[in-house]
Amino acid sequence: RLAPEYEAAATRYGVSGYPTLKDGEEAGAYDGPRTADGIVSHLKFISDKDASVVGFFRDLFSDGHSEFLKFAHTNVESLVKEYDDNGEGITLFRPSHLANKFEDKDLLTAYYDVDYEKKTFSHELSDFGLESTTGEVPVVAIRFVMQEEFSRFLQDYFDGNLKRYLKSEPIPETNDGPVKMDATANDVPSPYEVKGFPTIYFSPANKK
């Protein structure tokens, strides 16, 4: 017979057989092998520091759910509502040590330890109006050129306080000839796309 405090816990969590293994308030009962090796294997799985992928499904007999059973799944209503408004989907859960203060922000790609003198990267600086590599260059650029400390630059970017850099030649003193531009020295405005040279677009006079 269980001690009173354990009997209350067993009643609260619906424990009717032994051994029963539960993890968390909303977790379902462990339904794996009722052996020491099976339980240890399950505990190692849920305590592993690697990222976890959890599937949410409306239909427990769908092809997607059947395939996902090879990994992990849940149909606990509260969890489904908390992590997926549509009631179905796959969610990646990462350990907290991988989180940072810039989560849920724009995707940032940073180049570092790059030799801009090499041909492969020589055009990267010119795209941001930085033609010389002899002096200091920004740590990062996100269509904006960094002017100061890195974290402040990122915060200003996320707050929308940065002025976007557009590669552009000086305005010509005279511009009475055919409309033309050097796509290697200027950012091409939308909706035009340049994939080769020469590229010609026709815009009717009444649809500029």
UniProtKB/Swiss-Prot annotation:
Residues carrying the site annotation Lowers pKa of C-terminal Cys of first active site: 34
Any GO molecular function: protein disulfide isomerase activity
One example of a Gene Ontology biological process annotation: protein folding
Positions of disulphide bridges: none
Record-stated family: Belongs to the protein disulfide isomerase family.
Keyword Ubl conjugation: no
Modification(s) after translation: Within the major histocompatibility complex class I (MHC I) peptide loading complex forms reversible disulfide-linked heterodimers with TAPBP as part of its protein folding chaperone activity. This is essential to assist the dynamic assembly of the MHC I complex with high affinity antigens in the endoplasmic reticulum. Phosphorylated.
Enzyme class label: isomerase
Residues that bear N6-succinyllysine: 44
Protein name: Protein disulfide-isomerase A3
Record-linked InterPro entries: Thioredoxin-like_sf
Oligomer status and interactors: Part of the major histocompatibility complex class I (MHC I) peptide loading complex composed of TAP1, TAP2, B2M, MHC heavy chain, TAPBP, PDIA3, and CALR. Interacts with ERP27 and CANX. Interacts with SERPINA2 and SERPINA1. Interacts with ATP2A2.
Domain of life: Eukaryota
PANTHER family: PROTEIN DISULFIDE ISOMERASE, PROTEIN DISULFIDE-ISOMERASE A3
Keyword annotations of the record: Acetylation, Adaptive immunity, Disulfide bond, Endoplasmic reticulum, Immunity, Isomerase, Phosphoprotein, Redox-active center, Repeat
All copies of domain Thioredoxin, residue ranges: 1-44, 151-208
Main location: endoplasmic reticulum
Annotated compartments: Endoplasmic reticulum; Endoplasmic reticulum lumen; Melanosome
Residues modified to Phosphothreonine: 133
EC numbers, comma separated: 5.3.4.1
PTM sites of type N6-acetyllysine: 49, 163
Tissue specificity statement from the Swiss-Prot or TrEMBL entry: In the caput epididymal spermatozoa, detected in the mid-peice and at low levels in the principal piece. In the cauda epididymal spermatozoa, detected at very low levels in the principal piece and not in the mid-piece (at protein level).
Catalysed reaction equations from the record: Catalyzes the rearrangement of -S-S- bonds in proteins
Spans through the membrane: none
Function comment: Protein disulfide isomerase that catalyzes the formation, isomerization, and reduction or oxidation of disulfide bonds in client proteins and functions as a protein folding chaperone. Core component of the major histocompatibility complex class I (MHC I) peptide loading complex where it functions as an essential folding chaperone for TAPBP. Through TAPBP, assists the dynamic assembly of the MHC I complex with high affinity antigens in the endoplasmic reticulum. Therefore, plays a crucial role in the presentation of antigens to cytotoxic T cells in adaptive immunity.
